[in-house]
Amino acid sequence: MSQESDNNKRLVALVPMPSDPPFNTRRAYTSEDEAWKSYLENPLTAATKAMMSINGDEDSAAALGLLYDYYKVPRDKRLLSVSKASDSQEDQDKRNCLGTSEAQINLSGGENRVQVLKTVPVNLCLSQDHMENSKREQYSVSITESSAVIPVSGITVVKAEDFTPVFMAPPVHYPRADSEEQRVVIFEQTQYDLPSIASHSSYLKDDQRSTPDSTYSESFKDGASEKFRSTSVGADEYTYDQTGSGTFQYTLEATKSLRQKQGEGPMTYLNKGQFYAITLSETGDNKCFRHPISKVRSVVMVVFSEDKNRDEQLKYWKYWHSRQHTAKQRVLDIADYKESFNTIGNIEEIAYNAVSFTWDVNEEAKIFITVNCLSTDFSSQKGVKGLPLMIQIDTYSYNNRSNKPIHRAYCQIKVFCDKGAERKIRDEERKQNRKKGKGQASQAQCNNSSDGKMAAIPLQKKSDITYFKTMPDLHSQPVLFIPDVHFANLQRTGQVYYNTDDEREGSSVLVKRMFRPMEEEFGPTPSKQIKEENVKRVLLYVRKENDDVFDALMLKSPTVKGLMEALSEKYGLPVEKITKLYKKSKKGILVNMDDNIIEHYSNEDTFILNMESMVEGFKITLMEI
């Protein structure tokens, strides 16, 4: 139904909708008195209300009854506290969204104040104290996308469950009368996934309230940080938020030494070549959240204690590497156990003493590592005390492009051979038991004069799990050992290649900055150069077509030049006279000989040598047998 008045009158429409909420209304204002006078002459009768009730429209009948009762009161006697809305553009910009799911509000009767709500479907309920004094059965109105005129008393505290910010269409500004005042509905939000429920007072400051149209909280204007991000934040914009140095916890499943020194990190005994489990987890304030982007990168490394500078550490590592039976021997290895690979990804051997991997802080990560060096491997003298080593773990934010870790922890280790860790623990237990017996005997003598009871002396207990100690220093760079040997599975001297496509550029920058080319400062190790040259030599067996015995051609370098020098030395051909060099396969394919064929496909192969004299020089063809 609708009616149009004079110039000072406005069109008001009440439209019942067929959706779940039985009654939707357009936004109404207090300046519509003249528009309602004609309807007051024909009030709702009991028969009309009964007919509407039969048709299942009790809420519409109740709402119309409230409106009729309201407009029967003269305008000058009403208690109206709806203020004039500001016409400034700033207020219009603030009218964004206020979203939740499916609205239902319980109203109290007998009052004649007007409350205007603008919202998308929310799940609303009055506070307990207000519900006890209200007549919910008589005046229950469901509010959906449209606005409703609702009589309430005072300031109504409303509780919103499962609050989720949404974005609405640009707001439309409606002018209000001069006598209107601003009214407020205070939303008390139930915070999900939080250990404690924050009261609605935490969102207000000095009893100030914002209008329902505003999505800006007063507490955010004074510099306070908001607790929830908008759903429009993309994955690339998210940076893992660390709350302090105690965010992460690492444990090593190895026997802890019984002789721990005060002020130093935990000491653990390991056996060389034996795998031990390391567990990584998050234990800080962020643990109660399910992070949307929660991947971090951790680097596990074996380093020397802090009293050794970079040059000393590299000197020790080079000495150890020169005494190994193979140049591929690593200081630290990670096992390819299924239990480990289910919790980590993107594993990289970034250095001989370090491995890198990514893991999800929402889940506990577990890796298995082994240390391949002894504590006494860094000196040629026998009987010297071994150097203390450390297992250090640096954790970096996955999307952050800084080379500064967000957390760092370490554990001291001593590495023994042939079950030496167990023998060391047994020796410490025997020494501790002897001290315990002596202590109890002396304590008994002291207490015999009093009550004859012996006081127990606190002793260190054996523990099979060692907790890493957090390091406050996050700025110093660890020393990563990368010898001057090229291997396909090793990313060396800052050249980092990732195995998956979802890696971020920030992580690559992080790893590149962590180590420097050693040959720039120290040069390659001579012993390694000799071994490398021995591996690169190529041996070929050749004979002429009419010969029965093969000649051996030893190439000093696996190149075309090396082959030409070997032919010149064996058959007396000037190197500069060899103009063409071909290889003919068993299938009869003739190809130009190049360095790649000689190095990778010709070692210890047999060929028939064919030499043709030409004007410009010799044409040599090696036919594969």
Swiss-Prot record:
Q: What does the UniProt keyword field contain?
A: Activator, DNA-binding, Membrane, Nucleus, Transcription, Transcription regulation
Tell me the disulfide pairings in this chain: none
* Entry superkingdom: Eukaryota
Which spans does this entry mark as compositional bias, Polar residues? Answer: 440-451
All copies of domain Grh/CP2 DB, residue ranges: 244-482
Miscellaneous comment as given in the Swiss-Prot or TrEMBL entry: GRHL genes (GRHL1, GRHL2 and GRHL3) show a paradoxal lack of redundancy despite their extensive sequence identity in the DNA-binding and protein dimerization domains and the fact that the core consensus DNA binding sites are identical. They have related but remarkably different functions during embryogenesis because of their differential spatiotemporal expression patterns during development.
Quaternary organization:
Homodimer, also forms heterodimers with GRHL1 or GRHL3.
Q: What is this protein called?
A: Grainyhead-like protein 2 homolog
Give the classification, highest ranks.
Eukaryota, Metazoa, Chordata, Craniata, Vertebrata
